[in-house]
Curated annotation (Swiss-Prot):
Regions crossing the membrane: 48-68, 100-120, 124-144, 154-174, 194-214, 230-250, 348-368, 397-417, 422-442, 451-471, 487-507, 510-530
Source organism: Schizosaccharomyces pombe (strain 972 / ATCC 24843)
Function: High-affinity transporter for external inorganic phosphate.
GO function terms (MF aspect): phosphate transmembrane transporter activity
Similarity-based family: Belongs to the major facilitator superfamily. Sugar transporter (TC 2.A.1.1) family.
Protein name: Putative inorganic phosphate transporter C1683.01
Cellular localization per UniProt: Endoplasmic reticulum membrane
Polar residues: compositionally biased ranges: 261-270
Superkingdom in the source lineage: Eukaryota
Pfam family, one: Sugar_tr
GO process annotations (BP): monoatomic anion transport; phosphate ion transmembrane transport
UniProt xrefs under NCBIfam families: 2A0109
């Protein structure tokens, strides 16, 4: 099926009009807009702060447990040294369950809020997840002192961190969908990356807050040995997240519905006419007779390939654009199933979901147990409890500053240059290589060498699949299924995180840290294979592709002149 659409350039009275790439049109429009920070407009900056603060909280709340775990060990389980039976005082099964609590809640939140966002709308849902985060945090830090059993205390923490995870999980599909739908095509990847990069600041803040709080309690902890004061430390660690959460709550609740979502709901009013017959193209010469030239260059290629190419995507004339707005399908269960019944759509969901799953096995396996890993490689030892906790926090801070945060910002500045697919592939390759080095030489590499490998792995994980697995579902799926598809992808990723949380300590005690690194390496290289299913989404407008497919009955077959371009840009199979 061929489609001839164009954006005229120049005087309408001229005999010849040239197609103009959409990115060029958007760039010209942006020249007339006031720039703010990092080239963002005021609206983009406000969107970045509202959605970005959510991911700041996501990272802070999800990873602060890594720094709280040693405190729980000292307070409730008699320290972190091994007992006479050779096992730690803090049972590994309970520790894994508490660490995984937020990730378990994430799955419910991502699926529930993703579906509700597509069914009820972004405006109806956005902000509700932050209410859950606030309530869960308050209840978490309000653990009564009347609970004496360490196991009961951990169950209290588990329950409210699970609810916290529901709210945090809901932020993933909603912030991704809203940002994608409010962004201009040539800056969409940068803006989504900026918002996701706030995760780095959240992790960094967690380490800094811990160091400051330990410093404030230095006298009673270090000099007097009053370690019960750690009760105040962990409650403040969790509780300080309330400040930004409350700050963005009202603006989120007041945010307007996105225009792209409104357009995707045109057929949801009960008028289920055939998209072909519901449009009126009788007066459009280009549609009646695609071979008509009239001075316009013809574009003889498939609609999906045409619209997906970042350097040739073009805007249709205004009358066609308005007609395409009515070619959408309602966001409901049958529409979702119908969309993903087609292999060329389902393979994208398979690619985004499995890549996220494999990534999170290694990513959360390292990050949720970073304090344990630092202790094992000899970095977090100290002469007393206070110095051990402080050195552990400093080790986490160094990893965040050296690898975690820079990785996000490399992605911000290069995502629109290198493209999503290349960044994801190189991230999987290099991170897998670091895990392979650690696995093969775990007992031979020095403490500094192991530490450097973890830093490099963090750098290329965040400048790679940790960022792009979030970007891909926001860009590759149209608005009518975007929230649900993003929620499914993220939820499967969290399944990998849960596996890592629950099995890491068990596996390291059975097969050792080196062999666990081999498992992480295999996950990274498995991600390479599933990345090949995905198209390059740089400059790709999934909503326009969806409208074209609906208009032509969903038979938009990809055609490319170059075999390399075909499998790389559009994905294999």
């Amino acid at each position: 099926m061929k489609l001839n659409i164009f954006k005229s350039h120049g005087d309408s009275n001229t005999a010849e009009e040239r197609p103009v790439p959409l990115e060029q049109v958007e760039a010209e429009d942006q020249q007339h807009e006031n720039r703010f920070w990092l080239g963002l407009t005021a609206k983009e900056f406000r969107l970045m702060m509202l959605a970005g603060v959510g991911f700041f909280l996501d990272s802070y709340d999800l990873f602060i447990i890594n720094l709280v775990t040693p405190i729980f060990e000292y307070l409730y389980w008699g320290g972190i040294e091994k007992g006479p039976n050779g096992k730690g005082h803090y049972p590994s099964g309970i520790r894994g369950l508490v660490n995984a609590a937020s990730n378990i809640g994430n799955i419910f939140g991502q699926l529930m809020f993703g579906f509700m966002g597509d069914f009820f709308g972004r405006k109806f849902v956005y902000g509700k997840e932050m209410i859950i985060v606030i309530i869960a945090t308050i209840l978490l830090i309000a653990m009564p002192k009347s609970i004496h059993s360490p196991l009961s205390k951990m169950m209290w923490v588990f329950c409210w961190r699970w609810l916290l995870g529901v709210g945090i999980g809901g932020d993933y599909p909603m912030s991704a969908a809203i940002t994608s739908e409010r962004s201009k095509l040539n800056r969409r990847g940068t803006l989504i990356s900026l918002i996701f990069a706030f995760q780095g600041f959240g992790t960094l803040a967690g380490a800094i807050v811990t160091i400051i709080l330990l410093g404030c309690f230095e006298h009673p902890l270090n000099r007097e040995g009053h370690y019960r004061k750690l009760e105040g430390v962990w409650r403040l660690q969790f509780g300080l997240a309330l400040v930004p959460a409350i700050g963005v709550l009202i603006p989120r609740l007041m945010m307007e519905e996105t225009q792209k979502f409104k357009n995707s709901q045109q057929l949801n009013s009960g008028d289920n006419r055939d998209p072909k017959t519901s449009l009126n193209f009788e007066d459009d010469e280009l549609v009646k007779n695609p071979s008509v030239t009239k001075g316009h260059p013809e574009i003889h290629e498939s609609s999906e390939n045409y619209l997906s190419r970042s350097n040739t995507v073009e805007n249709e004339p205004e009358n066609i654009e308005k007609q395409f707005e009515s070619v959408s399908a309602p966001a409901n269960r049958s529409g979702f199933i119908q969309y993903f019944r087609q292999w060329h759509h389902f393979k994208h969901l398979l690619g985004t979901s499995v890549c996220w799953f494999l990534l999170d096995i290694a990513f959360y396996g390292v990050n949720l147990n970073q304090s344990v890993i630092l202790k094992n490689i000899g970095f977090s030892s100290g002469t007393n409890e206070y110095r051990t906790l402080m050195k552990n926090a400093i080790g986490n801070l160094i990893i965040a500053v050296a690898g975690y945060v820079p990785g996000y910002w490399f992605n911000v500045f290069l995502v629109e240059i290198l493209g999503r697919k290349w960044i994801q592939l190189q991230g999987f390759v290099i991170t897998g290589l670091m895990f392979a080095i650690l696995a093969g030489r775990w007992n031979e590499i020095s403490t500094g060498g192991r530490f450097a490998c973890f830093v490099i792995a963090q750098l290329f994980s965040n400048f790679g699949p940790n960022s792009t697995t979030f970007i891909y579902p926001a860009e590759v799926f149209p608005a009518r299924v975007r929230g649900t598809a993003h929620g499914i992808s993220a939820a499967l990723g969290k399944c990998g995180a849960i596996l890592a949380s629950l099995l890491f300590n068990f596996l390291t005690s059975i097969i050792g840290y080196g062999n666990v690194m081999w498992i992480f390496c295999g996950c990274m290289w498995g991600g390479i294979l599933f990345t090949l299913l995905l198209p390059e989404t740089k400059g790709r407008d999934a909503d326009e592709i969806d409208r074209v497919e609906l208009f032509y009955g969903g038979d938009g077959k990809v055609e490319c002149n170059s075999k390399w371009k075909s499998w790389y840009v559009n994905g294999i199979f």
